[in-house]
Curated annotation (Swiss-Prot):
It comes from Danio rerio. Keywords: Cell projection, Coiled coil, Cytoplasm, Cytoskeleton. It comes from the Eukaryota. This is Centrosomal protein kizuna. PANTHER family: CENTROSOMAL PROTEIN KIZUNA. Centrosomal protein required for establishing a robust mitotic centrosome architecture that can endure the forces that converge on the centrosomes during spindle formation. Required for stabilizing the expanded pericentriolar material around the centriole. InterPro entries: Centrosomal_kizuma. Residues 105-184, 215-347, 571-603, 620-665, 677-706 are annotated as: Disordered. Belongs to the kizuna family. One of its GO terms (biological process) is spindle organization. Residues 272-283 have a biased composition (Low complexity).
Length: 706
């Protein structure tokens, strides 16, 4: 009852008053705080604080920007100083250019002066010899060399070797009248400068003589280069054109014996104009023309470097190809002219006679080459470094057998340069040996080498001639169509090569494009222009072969119990075995067919009568096949039957066995699937599957499908 006294209530009332006062005080403070928060003074202070923060941040950014700008200015100044250091001073180059240009101009002027001085000295040389009584002088000119005075029978001919360094020595036994040969008016500047070196040395112009000798050496080097270039061009033209060639020694009958390189001269390059009576050694004449051509080049360079002069090279070529007809000066000028004309006519007659003989020889060799090409297979098989057709097919089969069991990478992408290994492979394949211990990359290299040789040994010079490619490259999609257009020998090589390509594609060793890029050039001539068409044709054939997938051994054995009804068109049409089935061995197919015929299942032993429509279809297919075989026999040469007889017989046996195995047991099922008849009940299937005796007469099932 202590809770009911007055003290308790007083205490409770005081506590409630205190709580009420504190609550009222809290409300007042909240109102004051809210009014302060909403006051303009506080908002102004907040804005001032934010502005101060912004101002401080801007000041810091300004300081950083100034520092960065100062750094950039310093970098720019450094770059400018480095650019000034590495800048090119073109003024020095221009100055050097002007100096060299002036130097070249001075050299040209000095050269022209030396040439004119040498010419004038050459013109003044005969008079100088007559006054001083020198015992040695010589000149090289475009004509015969005749002696002065009464000594006409003692004339001599001079010959300059290709080195152009030989000089005529002073002969002590000759008198001055005989040593000084008759000078001709047409004397070249270079020859005069080279021959008059003794006179220049005897005179006071020793320095000028040295300059002339330097010019002479440069001219000799240029002459030798041009002669080598002309001879090389002549050899190339002779290789390109089958024209008759003739040696220079056979033209001149009374020429002086001279040690000169024997060059073969083509008839089309022989000069058509008659030889002049002043004809002498062609090397000296070519040297005269070369010196004139060099003077023309100098004048052309002085005239602002105009178009180059090609007359030098052409004149030199025409003179270097001119036959040597050097003759003794046994009589006067008129006699020498008539004699030179006689030798020229005799040389022309000899050229014509040699050309007729050479043309006959060329025709005979060409005829012999054609006959050798026709019988090239016998020589081809006898060569020790070449494979025969059978040996090449054996090599491909060995490679394909090893590809099925071994993992090979980059079969035809690695070249093997061991000749002994290649010879061993060729000898083993020629003897039909095994290649289990030999590297496949070496075998691949031999395949590429021998395929090219075999293709070149065929009658058309290649496996795929141009007429075949042009007629089939856009339409043909089956390999059999290409095979029908080839000869017997070419067909064997085509089967081996195409089967090998299919195996490479099937094993995924090479892509289709790589196979085409690798084998197409080997099946065509070296200069074939239809490579793209042949590549497209091979790509279409390989694509068709990959799309028409032939089952492997396991697939064919697993599916031998019941053939697919969707492939009735392929089963009905008798065709030759494919490349993959032919590769595994046709003898195994014959044995398997005999075993299947011996061990027939109860279903296969049931004789089922075929419909008349199906029999008519089989007859039409057989007639078409007989017609195609007759066309193939007509198109092939008579000796092709000897080469292909075993293969054709084996194909016929394989086709007959396959036809008897496949079409006989399931002819009724195939005919129903072919004609689209429906089988609503299972009674006929049960009847066919029910085991019956093998001697059941066939007339019990006459109305089975009627």
């Amino acid at each position: 009852m202590a809770f009911c006294n007055t003290e308790y209530f007083d205490q409770i009332g005081n506590i409630q008053k205190i709580i009420h006062e504190r609550e009222r005080r809290r409300h007042e403070l909240e109102e004051t705080l809210f009014s302060y928060l909403r006051s303009d003074e506080r908002l102004t202070r907040l804005k001032c604080a934010k502005m101060r923060c912004y101002a401080k941040e801007l000041h810091e950014r300004e300081q950083r920007a100034k520092t960065r700008n100062l750094e950039l200015l310093g970098n720019v100044e450094n770059l400018a100083s480095k650019l000034k250091e590495f800048s090119i001073d073109c003024s020095r180059l221009l100055q050097k250019r002007m100096e060299y240009k002036n130097h070249i101009t001075r050299l040209k002027k000095d050269r022209r002066k030396m040439g004119s001085r040498g010419k004038s000295e050459a013109d003044e040389h005969p008079s100088r010899l007559s006054t001083q009584g020198l015992s040695q002088s010589a000149a090289i000119f475009m004509g015969h060399q005749t002696s002065n005075g009464s000594s006409r029978n003692d004339g001599a001919t001079t010959k300059r070797l290709p080195s152009h360094t030989e000089q005529i020595p002073n002969h002590p036994s000759l008198p001055p009248s005989q040593s000084g040969l008759c000078m001709h008016s047409h004397v070249s500047k270079a020859s005069g400068a080279g021959i008059l070196s003794d006179d220049i040395l005897n005179s006071g112009d020793f320095l000028e003589g040295r300059r002339l000798s330097d010019v002479r050496e440069k001219q000799m080097e240029s002459d030798w280069d041009i002669s080598q270039r002309a001879r090389e061009q002549q050899r190339q033209e002779e290789l390109k054109s089958p024209h008759t060639t003739l040696k220079e020694a056979e033209v001149s009958s009374r020429s002086v014996t001279v040690n000169k390189p024997a060059d073969i001269v083509s008839l089309e390059h022989c000069p058509t104009r008659s030889p002049s009576p002043d004809t002498t050694d062609p090397s000296d004449a070519s040297h005269y023309m070369n010196s004139g051509g060099e003077d023309e080049e100098e004048s052309a360079e002085d005239k602002d470097d105009s178009a180059p002069i090609n007359q030098n090279h052409s004149d030199y070529t025409s003179n270097i190809l001119k036959p040597d007809t050097s003759m003794h000066s046994d009589s006067d000028d008129s006699a020498s002219q008539s004699q030179s004309g006689h030798h020229a006519s005799r040389g022309n007659a000899l050229i014509q006679e040699q050309s007729i003989k050479a043309m006959q020889t060329h025709c005979g060799s060409k005829h012999k080459k054609v006959s050798t090409w026709q019988s090239g297979q016998h020589h081809f098989s006898e060569s020790p470094n070449r494979l025969s057709m059978k040996g090449f097919c054996h090599l491909l089969k060995c490679i394909e057998q090893r590809l099925e069991t071994e993992d090979v990478v980059n079969l035809y992408r690695i070249s093997v340069n061991e000749q002994n290994l290649s010879d061993d492979i060729i000898s083993i394949c020629s003897q039909r040996g095994r290649l289990d211990d030999i590297d496949l990359h070496a075998c691949g290299a031999v395949v590429l080498q021998q395929l090219s040789m075999l293709s070149c040994s065929l009658p058309h010079g290649c496996l795929l001639p141009s007429d075949l490619i042009n007629s089939h490259w856009s339409t043909t999609s089956k390999p059999q169509q290409i095979r029908l257009c080839l000869s017997a020998e070419s067909a064997v090589l085509w089967d081996c090569c195409f089967t090998h390509m299919v195996q490479l594609q099937k094993q995924k060793l090479l892509s289709t494009d790589h196979i085409i890029q690798l084998f197409t050039p080997l099946l065509l001539p070296a200069d074939a222009t239809y490579t793209d068409k042949a590549g497209k044709l091979l790509k279409r054939l390989l694509t068709y072969k990959s799309e028409t997938h032939y089952p492997s051994k396991s697939e064919s054995s697993s599916s031998s119990s019941l053939p697919s009804l969707l492939n009735d068109s392929v089963e009905i049409k008798p065709a030759r075995p494919s490349g993959t089935n032919a590769q595994t061995g046709e003898e195994q197919e014959i044995q398997s067919a005999e075993e299947d015929s011996a061990d027939q299942s109860p279903v296969e032993s049931i004789p089922i009568r075929e419909t008349k429509a199906y029999q008519l279809l089989k007859q039409s297919v057989a007639q078409e096949r007989h017609w195609s075989d007759s066309e193939e026999e007509v198109s092939e040469p008579p000796d092709a039957h000897k080469l292909e007889k075993p293969e054709v017989q084996q194909d016929i046996l394989t086709q007959n066995n396959r036809k008897s195995v496949k079409t006989k047991p399931f002819s009724a099922v195939q005919s129903k699937a072919f004609w689209g008849e429906s089988d609503d009940s299972n009674s006929e299937i049960e009847m066919a599957l029910r085991p019956q005796s093998c001697n059941t007469s066939s007339h019990d099932f006459d109305d089975f499908y009627d």
